């Protein structure tokens, strides 16, 4: 599902932002 991949991408971006 593309939706699932999109959610994962958002999660990764959010985590990176929080870490940064």
Curated annotation (Swiss-Prot):
Keyword presence, Endoplasmic reticulum:
yes
Q: Does the keyword Endoplasmic reticulum apply?
A: yes
Sorted keywords for this record are: Endoplasmic reticulum, Membrane, Microsome
Q: Where is this gene product found?
A: Microsome membrane; Endoplasmic reticulum membrane
Q: How does the record describe its quaternary structure?
A: Dimer of 18 kDa and 60 kDa subunit.
What task does this protein carry out? May have spermidine-binding activity.
In its miscellaneous comment, the UniProt entry states: On the 2D-gel its MW is: 18 kDa.
- What name goes with this protein? Putative 18 kDa spermidine-binding protein
């Amino acid at each position: 599902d593309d939706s699932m991949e999109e959610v994962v991408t958002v999660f990764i971006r959010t985590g990176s932002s929080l870490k940064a």
